[in-house]
Amino acid sequence: MNEYNRARIRLLTNQEAIDFVSAINSDGTATRYALENFDRTYRVNARSLLGVLYFTTEHNEDTYLVNDDGGSIPTSIDKFRV
């Protein structure tokens, strides 16, 4: 498995999911971000609103933002960190 960074987040409302996706997509990079559950068995593209909305309905208690490219987690999502 590639080395990557991971941060626990919480998205409780649809508006928070929309704001989160907007923040991730405004970082100006092509970095691959994903949301995954605690044991890494379920993943979605964090840049996809549909994926994020679905993921938060199924796995909201244990949601992690992952940088698959080994870089840092953008500071624009700090307000969603747990």
Name the predicted role of every residue range:
Residues D69-G71:
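Extended, charge-rich low-complexity interaction segments
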Residues N2-L11:
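Short glycine-/aliphatic-rich beta-strand segments at the starts of folded cytosolic domains
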Residues Q15-Y33, T41-E61, I73-R81:
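Amphipathic alpha-helical interaction surfaces in cytosolic regulatory modules
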Residues F38:
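RNA-recognition motif
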Residues L12, T31-L35, N67:
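Structural preference for solvent-exposed beta-strand-turn elements
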